[in-house]
A protein has these predicted regions:
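Short, composition-biased local secondary-structure segments
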Residues: 1, 14, 67-71
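Active-site glycine/GP-rich loop and adjacent strand/helix microenvironment
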Residues: 28-202
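Conserved AMP-binding loop of ANL adenylate-forming enzymes
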Residues: 2-32
Length: 202
């Protein structure tokens, strides 16, 4: 939210997710702090000095940075971190991975986010349920199909996520087969959102 300090543990490289998340944070009115080429200890120092509210990184790096803090004797609770937004690889919706990260960062909650280079940001974690991702239906028309027959699957069944982009002019995609296997939630989401909810992440 506006006024939050968000630390991005990425360098300004070709990873598209970093750029879109960094830009989104600044558009929201957050102070966006890039990690650049700092070491783990250096990044922890910046986080401590600025009392950051949120950390953006991959799930494995969130765990790694937490282990570095333990090894260095850094009291991460003094940072005041409240949210860890993970992307770039599977993990944030896997209960054991999420629990490990939240154990290493007491007081912080993990939020999973998923996207892809071909289409951009695709899902965000439900605020009411860990491990449930909502598709950004204002940007995509999602379908879930049987990867072998290309027929639609019922809610609760696992299938391949197919996306049609809405409003993209430079590189629109129609019924793009992502290769990602997902399971649509069988009941309405308690958060009240009507966007497609994916149970268990990607």
């Amino acid at each position: 939210q506006a006024g939050d300090k968000v630390f991005f543990a990425f360098s300004f490289g070709p990873f598209l997710g970093f750029w879109t998340a960094f830009e989104a944070a600044t558009e929201l009115g957050c102070m966006a702090l890039p990690g650049g080429g700092l070491s783990g200890a250096g990044r922890l120092g910046v986080m401590m000095e600025n009392r950051v509210d949120a950390l953006c990184c991959t799930p494995t790096y969130a765990a790694h940075l937490g282990e570095v803090a333990r090894a260095e004797g850094v009291d991460v609770s003094a940072i005041g971190l409240r949210r860890i937004i993970v992307s770039g690889e599977a993990g944030g919706s896997i209960p054991a991975t999420r629990e490990r990260i939240e154990t290493l960062w007491p007081g912080a909650r993990v939020f999973d986010h998923h996207g892809m280079t071909e289409v951009g940001p695709v899902t965000h974690q439900c605020p009411a349920q860990a491990g449930v991702l909502h598709v950004l239906e204002e940007a995509y028309l999602p379908e879930i199909i049987d990867p072998k027959t290309a027929e639609p699957v019922a809610a609760g069944e696992t299938g391949e996520l197919v996306l049609t982009t809405l409003g993209r002019h430079g590189s629109p995609l129609i019924r793009y087969r992502t290769g990602d296997l997902v399971t649509a939630a069988e009941s309405p989401c308690p958060c009240g959102r009507l966007d497609l909810a994916l149970q268990g992440g990607i």
